[in-house]
Amino acid sequence: MAEITISIENENFIQVNLQPDQTVEDLKRRVEFETTILVNNQVLTLDGKVLDNEKKLSDYSIKGGDFLLITKNVLRAPQQRSQQPQQPQQPQQPQQQRQPQRDPLNSPQDILDHFTNNPEDLTQVINSNPALANAILSKDMKFLTHFVEQIKEQRRIQELALKDPYGEEYQKLAYQHIQQQNIEKNMQHAMEHTPEVFASVYMLYIECSINGHPLKAFVDTGAQQSIMSEKCAERCEISRIIDTRFHGIAKGVGTSKIIGRVHSTDLKLGNSLFSVSLSILQNQDVDFILGLDMLKRHQVILDLNRGVLQIANEKIEFLHEKDLKEILNKEQNDLEEDTKKATANSLSPSTTSTTTTTTTTTSPQTPTNATSPVNNNNNNNNNNNNTRPPINSPPVAKTPQPTPQPTTNQYASESNIQTLIGLGCSRDKAIRLLTQAKGNVDVAASMFFG
């Protein structure tokens, strides 16, 4: 069978089997299948002449090997619609020929029926839209339902444009569409020129010991003071020297109770010993945070090029991912639990897995008179009201691993996740792709198929 070539906006090209008896509108519907450009948005031209939807391809003497051009032009649709009532009634025979042809985009079942009866169309869809073709072959009703809903939404927007292009509702939708296009272009630019920004970044950890107990310290230049959890202080046997006069509430991304302060204890980095002051927090996920107080005091150099922390004459290597499995697994479970709680309580969505926010506050005041019980109590009250020690969010895990329970976020809705799973994508990867695609399931599917 002869084929014709159709250029889409001079960017993409598709091959279509030539059927001289079919109308121009039928040809546009086939193009709509492969490009999702609505029929009303298509302007089909041959040698610069616009083709009429009502006429057959044979009326324009179109033959195999001809080259047709399709451009998107929303403004042409109202003119065509307005001209239709003025046209005299055509003979009944052409209309009767088109009556049996149903719009295959009305429902998922219509799509399946159409491609079952037209295998040559399915072959073209396999080449142009693999995700849709896979859904048709596997009879994935969820994917097809979503596809039909998208087409109907596009048609609704088109109807609004025809009815009142300057109306508030259409202008709002048009603005959202333009904004989404700009976002997609920005993301595509980033994926092409700086793909590394989509990779997970691991926090900086080093090996150290507190009071002779080995620890993995989280190096955080955004933490104003060095912090330790209450449980870690017990393991390091320094709970007995916690000064509870420095208790209060630490406020940052969240809140945590400060039970006190250890004014000085031994910190071993490499082969050197340093004195460190610690704020002890009751509910702190990270065992030990090496804060800016120590980093500035000892003029620490964070050499990210060589992957080392230089303090005095010591050079301590930052830990690699393989050394942080226990920490990352714990943080991953915490992240999933927080996401479930946030979803259940309809709270604001949390940050994505590739973002970690660090917030610090001012340090506590030193008691003015440690020998007077009265002064101690007064200073204790002042610390409760005015003291804001540092608190920073724990580093977030790389990527959630598959779990029996569904995990969603603001971009990865359960329906979109199931759509990608139906394409053969794992749940974990589906969530990550939807997050990167800002919830656009089509973009996520394209990323999955490469």
Curated annotation (Swiss-Prot):
Region of interest: Disordered: 78-116, 335-410
Coiled coil region boundaries: 321-346
SMART domains: UBQ
UniProt xrefs under SUPFAM superfamilies: Acid proteases (SSF50630), UBA-like (SSF46934), Ubiquitin-like (SSF54236)
Entry superkingdom: Eukaryota
Keywords recorded for this protein, A-Z: Aspartyl protease, Coiled coil, Hydrolase, Protease
Cystine crosslinks: none
Presence of keyword Hydrolase: yes
Domain Ubiquitin-like: 2-77
GO BP: any one term: ubiquitin-dependent protein catabolic process
InterPro entries referenced in this protein's UniProt entry, alphabetically: Peptidase_aspartic_DDI1-type, Peptidase_aspartic_dom_sf, UBA, UBA-like_sf, Ubiquitin-like_dom, Ubiquitin-like_domsf
An example Gene Ontology molecular-function term: aspartic-type endopeptidase activity
Transmembrane segments: none
Biased composition (Polar residues): 104-116
Documented EC number(s): 3.4.23.-
Top EC class for this record: hydrolase
Stretches assigned to the UBA domain: 411-450
Segments of skewed composition (Low complexity): 78-99, 343-386
Gene3D superfamilies reported in the protein's UniProt record: Acid Proteases, DNA helicase RuvA subunit, C-terminal domain, Phosphatidylinositol 3-kinase Catalytic Subunit, Chain A, domain 1
PROSITE patterns registered for this protein in UniProt: UBA, UBIQUITIN_2
Family, per entry: Belongs to the DDI1 family.
Cited function: Probable aspartic protease.
Protein name (Swiss-Prot/TrEMBL): Protein DDI1 homolog
